């Protein structure tokens, strides 16, 4: 039987402006939260997959993709996968919006194991 995820509130939807990343500290994680122009909300670990990368919250959002701020790597906000020709993956967090609140759940790994 699959364990049910526990979602915790991280803020009001209005705090997450469209196409602008916002950093949230939650349960030992630094998370970059993004709201697309279509209103979808995504959360990724706020760490670039590039060896010399910086915080992802400073990146640019276009559709369901994030462009890493220092090296312009294209990252799928839905999966955390870096798009070709580059390679890598960013840890993504389950997100849900209920009413005017945004909730987040833990990924399948702990920060110490990443």
What are these regions (language model features)?
Residues 48, 68-71:
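Short cysteine clusters
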Residues 1-63, 77, 91-114:
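N-terminal pre-ligand scaffold of iron-sulfur
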Residues 62-69, 82-91:
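Short cysteine/histidine-rich metal-coordination sites, predominantly Zn2+-binding motifs
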Residues 74:
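Short helix-to-coil "ATP-lid" hinge immediately C-terminal to the conserved N-box Asn in the Bergerat
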